[in-house]
A protein has these predicted regions:
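Low-complexity, acidic/polar, glycine-enriched regions of mature
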Residues: 22-194
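Bacterial N-terminal signal peptides
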Residues: 7-18
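Positively charged n-region of N-terminal signal peptides that target proteins for export
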Residues: 1-6
Length: 194
C-alpha cells in the first residue's frame, strides 16, 4: 500500500528521454523496447516485516527532438502502472496496486496522466547529458533533473523524487512503525524508434 508512491518515479522517465538527442528531430520513443521502474523503500521501527516495492511504469508516448534546442516529451498512463513484487502473494500485490492507484496516492481517476517536458538538455561529454524539465504528477508540476548516459542505442539513467513535492503523503501503517520513504528512485532504459 505504502509503495504506491513509486508512481512519482514515472515522471523522472521523461528526464532521461532528453538524453536521446543523438537520434534526430522528432523521433518517437520505442515504447515496446523502453522500460521504466520505480523503486519504493520502506522505513520505520518494524520495516523488517515489510517489503520494498518495484513498480513498472510503461511509457505510453514520447518524443525526442534534437533540432535547434534539444527537447523531450513523455507521457505515462498512471492507470497502467503495475506492482511487480514477485515475493509478495497475488492478493497482497492486488491490495498494494489498489492503494497505489487510489485517492490517497496517485488518484488515477482524477489524475490519469503523468508527464514530463524538458526545459534544457546539456551535454556533459561523450554520451552523457544533464536533462532538466518539469514533471507533472498528481496535478502538481515540479522541476526534475537527471543525468543520462548512452550506449548501444540505449539511454539509461536514474533520478530521485519526493512524493511530498507532489502533494502525496507517504503511506504509513501501524501507527507509523512501518512506512514508505518519501524519496522514490526512478530507473529507466529508453530506446528511440528506428
Amino acid at each position: 500500500m505504502r509503495f504506491t508512491k513509486l508512481a512519482l518515479g514515472m515522471l523522472a522517465i521523461g528526464i532521461w528521454l532528453g538524453s536521446t538527442t543523438a537520434y534526430g528531430q522528432g523521433k518517437a520513443i520505442d515504447v515496446n523496447r523502453s522500460s521504466m521502474k520505480i523503486l519504493v523503500s520502506k522505513s520505520g521501527a518494524f520495516s523488517a516485516f515489510a517489503h520494498n516495492h518495484e513498480i513498472e511504469a510503461p511509457i505510453a508516448q514520447g518524443k525526442i527532438d534534437s533540432s535547434g534546442n534539444a527537447s523531450v516529451q513523455l507521457r505515462v498512463d498512471a492507470r497502467e502502472m503495475r506492482v511487480m513484487d514477485p515475493e509478495v502473494d497475488v492478493d497482497k500485490r492486488a491490495e498494494i496496486q489498489r492503494t497505489m492507484q487510489g485517492e490517497t496516492v496517485l488518484d488515477v481517476e482524477k489524475f490519469p496522466e503523468i508527464s514530463y517536458q524538458s526545459t534544457s538538455v546539456t551535454s556533459r561529454g561523450d554520451d552523457h547529458w544533464e536533462v532538466r524539465g518539469d514533471l507533472t504528477l498528481h496535478g502538481k508540476k515540479q522541476p526534475v533533473a537527471v543525468e543520462v548516459s548512452s550506449k548501444d542505442g540505449h539511454y539509461r539513467g536514474s533520478a530521485s523524487i519526493k512524493q511530498s513535492d507532489f502533494g502525496i503523503e507517504p503511506i504509513r501503517i501501524a501507527g507509523g512503525t512501518v512506512k514508505v520513504k518519501d524519496e522514490l528512485r526512478i530507473e529507466f532504459d529508453i530506446v528511440a524508434a528506428q
